[in-house]
Amino acid sequence: MKNNFSKYQGLGNDFIIFDARSNNLDHLFSKNKDNFIEHLCNRNFGIGADGIILILESNNKCFVRMKIYNSDGSEPEMCGNGIRCLIAFLNDNNEINELSEIPIETKAGLILTSIDCNENIKVNMGEPILSPLDIPTKLLMNSLKVPNGVITLKDQILNVYAASMGNPHMIVFVNDIEGIPFQEWGSFLEKHNTFPNDTNVHFVEIIDKSNIKVKVWERGCGPTLACGTGACACLVVTSKLGKTLNNANVYLPGGKLEVEWPNQSGPVFMQGPALKVFSGEIDI
């Protein structure tokens, strides 16, 4: 059976989007997700992407429901770049029109979004989670109210922090982000037992109080060019530790996100682009 799809990217973090509001794709993906999704996301034998987004009807009075799969078939709670790609898709298909706020249902809860006249997409990412029990992580809360601890990796002792934006994130500060053994550290830390559900891993280099560089190892995907929830988690931790202001530019391999956590309370806001790559038709 042929199905239409569109491929979108947010700072190089790319997704295959299927509108599943009027077909049985949700059931099909749920039943065959592992090999099926890995094949579609394979960059040599499939369409190629970091993940797949299904657009579904919402039962909670939201505009739509977003269901997202990582390239390994796992289902994350939320994805900041993915939700921007979803909004760009809806906007390109003239579904949003004059709406000032677009509520989206996700596995992590209700996410409020908006899009401006320049097609920059702003997302209310909700309040960060810093409780070790709720992230979840075995790291303990430090005096600055951030989960913190050390992890030994061969001859390295890494000082690590944790936060959640509906999904778990480990933050590791480094002096030279290009000088670390990224593949080795990322793959090891993703599966570390300090995080019972595995974790996204972010290596952070502080440029100044308003700018940071982040390199992403995404849970279920490996290296990606950007991670929206990760950028937010990094800003939460850097601002709590006094390393940045409450708003900063987060420079990822795929580009820049603007992240703000006003007064270090309430929701975190993220703003950045999302663009269509191409559309097509595939037998499923």
From Swiss-Prot:
GO terms for biological process: lysine biosynthetic process via diaminopimelate. InterPro entries: DAP_epimerase_AS, DAP_epimerase_DapF. Substrate binds at residues 13, 70, 80-81, 167, 200, 218-219, 228-229. Pathway: Amino-acid biosynthesis; L-lysine biosynthesis via DAP pathway; DL-2,6-diaminopimelate from LL-2,6-diaminopimelate: step 1/1. Keywords: Amino-acid biosynthesis, Cytoplasm, Isomerase, Lysine biosynthesis. It catalyses: (2S,6S)-2,6-diaminopimelate = meso-2,6-diaminopimelate. The record marks 169, 218 as: Could be important to modulate the pK values of the two catalytic cysteine residues. Its main location: cytoplasm. The keyword Isomerase applies. It is found in: Cytoplasm. One of its GO terms (cellular component) is cytosol. It holds the Pfam family DAP_epimerase. Its EC number is 5.1.1.7. GO terms for molecular function: diaminopimelate epimerase activity. PROSITE patterns: DAP_EPIMERASE (PS01326). The active site is at residues 79, 227. Signal peptide: none annotated. It comes from the Bacteria. Homodimer. Belongs to the diaminopimelate epimerase family. Catalyzes the stereoinversion of LL-2,6-diaminopimelate (L,L-DAP) to meso-diaminopimelate (meso-DAP), a precursor of L-lysine and an essential component of the bacterial peptidoglycan. This is Diaminopimelate epimerase. It comes from Prochlorococcus marinus (strain NATL1A). The gene is dapF.
